[in-house]
From Swiss-Prot:
A GO term, aspect molecular function: ATP binding
InterPro entries per the UniProt record, alphabetical: ATPase_NBD (IPR043129), Heat_shock_70_CS (IPR018181), HscA_NBD (IPR042039), HSP70_C_sf (IPR029048), HSP70_peptide-bd_sf (IPR029047), Hsp_70_fam (IPR013126), ISC_FeS_clus_asmbl_HscA (IPR010236)
Family (UniProt): Belongs to the heat shock protein 70 family.
Physiological role: Probable chaperone. Has a low intrinsic ATPase activity which is markedly stimulated by HscB.
Name of this protein: Chaperone protein HscA homolog
Length: 617
């Protein structure tokens, strides 16, 4: 007799089968892959025993060369060797050329304005370059784990926007990987740190990588990792230390600038090696194109001090957002290879008033956290052991009448999240509504970032204010936003998934937060003025419509003249810049039209009761 295997839909017939999953730290300078084996998370090494894979791809031949071999070719083939491609993800060609004018690559724009790199092998975009790095990491994982991966968790900087996150997902798809989740890098570090130490309290995760800086303030409590606030800079990292030192060396050596692409790459490699040496030495002998000299750690630290101070400004802002004082932070976790720089450790320690934790390898901690999370999401470990709460870095809102912003999801709200709010029509007979989605902290639409627009059509004609349109904002676990608008009486709805064509420029996020505080008073005054103008428009339009409908029947010529004068006065005030004056004008107009409103009400009641008997009533 045959035995039938019965299982729940979607479940494995072997429920205890361990699924192969990996966490990938797709870094600006280096990338890593980690996994949980025998209950322990660790990075997976290549055949030479190396965890790090340089995030460098060479396209000089038919096959892409990735990692250390590509790095070795970077000086001789700079235009075909793509370095720090993570900085290019989600950016327009114009933005890249403005921000990184010294890049040696041959760029051209695609039809949608996104960058294409021209190489000997052919045209490549940043997504394709990232995919080639992911393929090598995936192959390493599959060889180490003995089979095909069921899924991966890929880390991204907390400040990556929708376009940059979507680009990361697209790269993984191109590499043939199933993405279980995108995970913020500081949060991944918190997972690795939290499981290792078991501590509870407020933790600061200071993540300074090759190309990005992130600061996260987290609360660890009974297995719950809650991100209280995030901050940082999407274009500040150890690469910038290298460039400053390279410029200093070029000046010391008396080199004529601009340098050729090949010389520039050689100089950067020398600068990087010198920077690394300063972690153990006070001075380094340097040879640059025939010039020999000694560079001291003190000279290097003076060059980079302003950049380190810039990271501490982000730390201060994040603490304020989290409503936490620096002395409340129990531990400071250092993440990213650039935190090996002694000045960084020293200044961070002074800022928080405690020695930063460096016992976990700062290069590997993010990948290890991602590996742990991948193990959970693959079903190898009950997720009840850990609850992860990420946050959105900037408020998401909608434009309302008068160019005002109504915030639907405030910044630092934990994700995934869905929030809904009801809106109505402004004019009689309105059959469509335009939904304008914005991002930012300011009160007026012009001061925020426009994300997308779409229209809801098919609203039944009704009096102004009678329709009920429910607008729902939903942010998934990867930080991607979808917006739905639905008219409640008919069920007609429209939806959009927000994917900006490219990401925020370098300091835009930080500037948006800074401006919201700098201009808080002016913004509230502008909002009050706009609100009064919208209300004045409503009163003016309503009164004009009422006079056109019933003025001849219910008003004398003198009363008409009085109301027209009130309307003209209110229009004049409405076009001014005094919110209080407009508010008073609205009150005066309401008072002047009170008798007219009563007569219209009486007329409506008489019309409704006409022909009815007392018994019916």
């Amino acid at each position: 007799m045959a035995l039938l295997q019965i299982a729940e839909p979607g479940q494995s017939s072997a429920p205890h089968e361990h699924k192969r999953a990996a966490g990938i730290d797709l870094g600006t300078t280096n990338s890593l892959v980690a996994s949980v084996r025998s209950g322990t998370a660790d990075t997976l090494k290549d055949a030479q025993g190396r965890s790090l894979l340089p995030s460098i791809v060479n396209y000089a031949n038919e096959e892409a060369i990735v990692g250390y071999e590509a790095k070795a070719l970077s000086e001789s083939q700079p235009q075909d060797t793509i370095i720090s491609v993570k900085r290019l993800l989600g950016r327009s060609l114009t933005d890249i050329q403005t921000r990184y004018p010294s890049l040696p690559y041959r760029f051209k724009a695609s039809e949608n304005g996104l960058p294409v790199l021209q190489t000997t092998q052919g045209d490549k975009n940043p997504i394709e370059v990232s995919a080639d790095i992911l393929k090598v990491l995936a192959k390493r994982a599959e060889e180490s784990l003995g089979g095909e991966l069921s899924g991966v968790v890929i880390t991204v900087p907390a400040y990556f926007d929708d376009a940059q996150r979507a680009g990361t997902k697209d790269a993984a798809k191109l590499a043939g990987l199933h993405v279980l989740r995108l995970l913020n890098e500081p949060t991944a570090a918190a997972i690795a740190y939290g499981l290792d130490s078991g501590q509870e309290g407020v933790i600061a995760v200071y993540d300074l990588g090759g190309g990005t800086f992130d600061i996260s303030i987290l609360r660890l409590s009974k297995g719950v990792f809650e991100v209280l606030a995030t901050g940082g800079d999407s274009a500040l990292g150890g690469d910038d230390f290298d460039h400053l030192l390279a410029d200093f060396l070029a000046e010391q050596a008396g080199l004529e600038t601009p340098l050729s692409a090949e010389k520039n790459r050689t100089l950067l490699n020398i600068a990087t090696a010198t920077k690394i040496a300063f972690s153990e030495q006070d001075s380094v002998e340097v040879e640059v194109f025939g010039w020999k000299g000694v560079v001291t750690r003190e000279q290097f630290e003076e060059l980079i001090r302003p950049l380190v101070k810039k990271t501490l400004m982000s730390c201060r802002r994040a603490l304020k957002d989290a409503d936490v004082e620096a002395d409340e932070v129990l531990e400071v976790v250092m993440v990213g290879g650039s935190t090996r720089t002694l000045l960084v450790r020293e200044m961070v320690g002074e800022f928080f008033g405690r020695t930063p934790l460096t016992n976990i390898n700062p290069d590997e901690v993010v990948a290890i956290g991602a590996g742990i999370q991948a193990d959970i999401l693959a079903g190898n470990k009950p997720d009840s052991e850990m609850l992860l709460l990420d946050v959105i870095p900037l408020s998401l809102g909608i434009e309302t009448m008068g160019g005002l912003v109504e915030k639907i999801i405030p910044r630092n709200t934990t994700i995934p999240v869905a929030r809904a709010q009801e809106f109505t029509t402004f004019k009689d007979g309105q059959t469509a509504m335009s939904v304008h989605i914005v991002q930012g902290e300011r009160e007026m639409v012009d001061d925020c970032r426009s994300l997308a627009r779409f229209s809801l059509k098919g609203i039944p004609p009704m009096a102004a204010g009678a329709a009920h349109i429910r607008v729902t904002y939903q942010v998934d676990a990867d930080g991607l936003l979808s917006v739905t608008a639905m008219e409640k009486s008919t069920g007609v709805q429209s939806e959009i998934q927000v994917k900006p064509s490219y990401g925020l420029s370098d300091d835009e996020v930080a500037n948006m937060l800074r401006d919201s505080m700098t201009y808080a008073k002016e913004d509230m005054q502008a909002r009050a003025l706009a609100e009064q103008r919208v209300e004045a428009d409503r009163v003016i339009e309503g009164l004009i419509a009422a006079m056109q409908a019933d003025g001849d029947e219910l008003l004398s010529e003198a009363e008409k003249a009085t109301l027209l004068q009130a309307i003209e006065s209110l229009i004049e005030l409405r076009n001014g810049n005094e919110a209080n004056a407009i508010e008073q004008g609205i009150k005066d107009t309401d008072k002047a039209s009170q008798d007219f409103a009563s007569r219209r009400m009486d007329k409506s009641i008489r019309a409704a009761l006409a022909g009815q008997s007392i018994d019916t009533i």
